[in-house]
């Protein structure tokens, strides 16, 4: 059995789906922008290294407070169809289909919340989808619980270990991994065939030195500043996808 493992945000599509989903919800529920009163100070604490990424993610998700499970499921379904699918890189979709045709087990492995990572993975025909395990309750609480770690760095490898052969030979023979992020270096080094997508200078330097493929599909924001501007608008519920 061989594997093809894909990151989600800025890998399959040019956006961070965490703020893109927030934008989608806030445009339909404008009063939920009140979450910013909590998230703003929390972001300052995170910048000062006084709050963990995991805790900040819980505060960020406060915009979901009070939603019932049927309401959240309806939002996720609409988000996948209306925002995610149209934004996917055709070049990366082609890679997904190429790996499927080769008979590889497709794994979507993301730090984004599992409740919509699973929906995206199912819609795209992935065999397995893994995200940060945000606990769903009915209704959603102010600060949703996260079961386990933020699914990033080595946590991604731990989260999919049960899918792998009992005896591992590393790098995993015949396996592929796709990511934009230096945070995914453990994942990229885990496989025989790493592929980077619009890597930052640090990751690009490693990719060039290691002779890893670098994919640069067209994207709507040509600079890091433009990407961060889009993220800010999304966090405010003011972003309109081109």
Residue ranges and their predicted role:
Residues 1-49:
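Active-site neighborhood of HAD-like aspartate-dependent phosphohydrolases
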Residues 13, 48, 61-65, 118, ...:
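Amphipathic alpha-helical interaction elements
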Residues 16, 67, 155:
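Conserved active-site and cofactor/substrate-binding residues in soluble primary-metabolism enzymes
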Residues 41-58, 138-146, 160:
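N-terminal-biased segments
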Residues 56-90:
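Metal-dependent phosphoesterase signature
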């Amino acid at each position: 059995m061989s594997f093809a493992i894909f990151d989600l945000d800025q890998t399959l599509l040019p956006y961070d789906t965490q703020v893109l989903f927030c934008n989608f919800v806030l445009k339909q529920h404008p009063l939920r922008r009140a979450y910013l009163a909590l998230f703003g100070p929390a972001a300052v604490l995170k910048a000062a290294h006084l709050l963990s990424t995991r805790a900040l993610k819980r505060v960020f998700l406060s915009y979901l407070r009070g939603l019932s499970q049927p309401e959240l499921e309806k939002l996720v379904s609409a988000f996948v169809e209306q925002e995610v699918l149209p934004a996917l890189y055709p070049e990366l979709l082609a890679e997904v289909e190429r790996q499927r045709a080769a008979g590889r087990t497709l794994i979507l492995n993301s730090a984004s919340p599992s409740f919509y990572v699973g929906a995206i993975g199912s819609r795209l025909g992935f065999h397995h989808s893994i995200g940060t395990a945000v606990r769903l309750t009915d209704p959603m609480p102010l600060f949703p619980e996260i079961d386990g770690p933020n699914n990033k760095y080595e946590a991604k490898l731990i989260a999919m270990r049960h899918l792998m052969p009992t005896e591992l030979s590393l790098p995993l023979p015949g396996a592929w991994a796709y990511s934009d992020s230096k945070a995914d270096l453990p994942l990229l080094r885990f496989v025989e065939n790493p592929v980077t997508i619009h890597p930052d200078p640090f990751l690009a330097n490693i990719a060039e030195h290691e002779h890893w493929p670098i994919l640069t599909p067209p994207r709507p924001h040509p600079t890091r500043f433009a990407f961060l501007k889009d993220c800010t608008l999304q966090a405010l519920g003011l972003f309109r996808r081109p």
